[in-house]
Curated annotation (Swiss-Prot):
SUPFAM superfamilies associated with the record: P-loop containing nucleoside triphosphate hydrolases
Keyword Glycoprotein included in the entry's annotation: no
Domain Guanylate kinase-like intervals: 14-194
Name used for this protein in its record: Guanylate kinase
Length: 220
């Protein structure tokens, strides 16, 4: 297993950081903050999709746009580590892209739902850190959706029903953050990621580091 990322002289394998939440709980905002923070050094996983490219989107930057036939080939050959169908379009993550990034010590952020998180944890459990964001109350969640002023009352009600179902999946995740205050929640998630980066089993370079440390002659 190639490991090329080095921190404090110790090589480390990359992470797949999965963040999920019901609509309105704060996932997208926190994901954006993580990606914009240069100290976190996270990159967004770029999915393949069969969806039509929008005028503002760039192939290879926002998504890799492919045909349904090509997607089916990738899926059937187990070249996707997770995939889902959303509103009639297919989305997925290329296994090869993820494995190259992990071996290079790169940490990737996955903004996906519980189904995608399930697939990642089943296929690459040692590399996944999963975080589920909860609202403090359902009333607060509804108020946040209302404040968006993007959806009709009917759509908001549907989102709330979906949220109740999604929240039931919280037990599948490694970490749970109750997002009552954005700043505190963001700080908590940064702490989770930084702690996971220091785990012994993610840092195979520690063996050589400790061996060298013990062989050192402090008098030299």
């Amino acid at each position: 297993m190639a490991i090329s990322s080095v921190e404090n002289g110790v090589a480390r394998r990359g992470l797949m950081v999965v963040i999920s939440s019901p609509s309105g709980a704060g996932k997208s905002t926190i994901a954006r903050l993580l990606l914009e923070d240069p100290k976190m050094k996270l990159s967004l996983s770029i999915s393949v999709t069969t969806r039509q490219r929008r005028p503002s989107e760039i192939d290879g930057v926002h998504y890799h746009f492919i045909t349904i036939r090509e997607f089916e080939r990738l899926r059937d050959n187990d070249e996707l580590i997770e995939w889902a169908e959303v509103h009639g379009n297919f989305y997925g993550t290329l296994r090869e892209t993820a494995e190259i990034a992990l071996a290079d010590g790169q940490d990737m952020l996955f903004d996906i739902d519980w189904q995608g998180a399930d697939q990642l944890q089943a296929k690459m459990p040692a590399d996944v850190v999963s975080i589920f964001i909860l609202p403090p109350t359902m009333r607060e969640l509804q108020q946040r959706l209302n404040r968006r002023a993007e959806d009709t009352a009917e759509v908001i009600e549907t989102r709330l029903q979906n949220a109740r179902f999604e929240i039931q999946k919280w037990v599948k995740y490694d970490y749970i953050v109750i997002n009552e205050d954005l700043d505190r929640s963001y700080a908590a998630i940064k702490s989770i990621i930084n702690a996971e980066r220091l785990r012994r089993d993610r840092r195979p370079g520690l063996f050589d580091f400790v061996t060298g440390l013990l062989e050192e002659d402090p008098g030299m």
